[in-house]
Regions:
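Outer-membrane beta-barrel domain signature
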Residues: 6-10, 61-66, 76, 107-113, ...
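C-terminal beta-signal and adjacent terminal beta-strands/loops
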Residues: 141-150, 170-207
């Protein structure tokens, strides 16, 4: 539902500022490791809100020039302890808020829904001479994200559980071609109840 269809502006207006610091140093040999820190802030001056929490049976689209921002902090670490062995780790924290309208005419500032609060990743890669074989393994941890309330009552909001993901890949170089074999989601993580009220698709609680 778009209450003010004629005045609805589909274009968002925002300003992003930030910076990065990088330091190279040695753990085993000179210059074998790099540490970097990034910070970026996006300040929204006109947001397009797809509000799932205005009411229990509608998604309301509207513009908002009220407080809305995203702060992102990220730390990256890369290390080559021995030749052809690369280790990479990263951690990202996200603080994201927006202001939504309420049916009583007031506003509420809430954490932006479905945005993970943090994410961390570890990747280890080893290559044989001339990179004929490359072995790659990745572990990832996804932090909780706020789930929009389905009742219209902001006190009912919940958070998704944090969950890990694991990936592995082997590649073989044959002439000008690369042959890949790999597996994603090795631990077979599955989301519980991905569809709410799946057995009753015409109810107001279906999502």
């Amino acid at each position: 539902v778009i209450p003010d269809f004629d005045g609805f502006n589909r274009l968002e207006k925002a300003l992003t500022v930030g910076g990065s610091l990088t330091q190279t140093f040695g753990l085993v040999s000179p210059g074998d490791a790099t540490l970097s820190f990034d910070y970026f802030r996006t300040q929204f001056y006109n947001s397009v809100i797809a509000d799932q929490e205005y009411s229990a049976d509608q998604i309301v689209l509207y513009n908002s020039d009220k407080r809305s921002y995203t702060d992102t902090y990220q730390i990256d670490f890369s290390w080559t302890p021995v030749e052809r062995l690369d280790i990479f780790a990263t951690f990202r924290y996200t603080d994201s808020e927006m202001t939504i309208d309420r049916p009583d005419g007031k506003t509420a500032r809430v954490e932006r829904p479905l945005v993970s609060q943090y994410k961390t990743l570890l990747n280890i890669q080893y290559a044989t001479k001339f990179r004929r074989w490359v072995f790659d393994a990745t572990a990832q941890l996804n932090g909780p994200a706020r789930i929009p309330t389905q009742t219209g009552d902001l006190a009912d909001d919940k958070y998704s559980p944090r969950y890990p993901m694991f990936f592995a890949q082997i590649s073989r170089k044959v002439g000008k071609f690369d042959i890949y074999a790999g597996c994603e989601n090795i631990a077979d993580y599955r989301q519980h109840d991905p569809i709410l009220n799946a057995d009753n698709p015409y109810s107001t609680g279906f999502n």
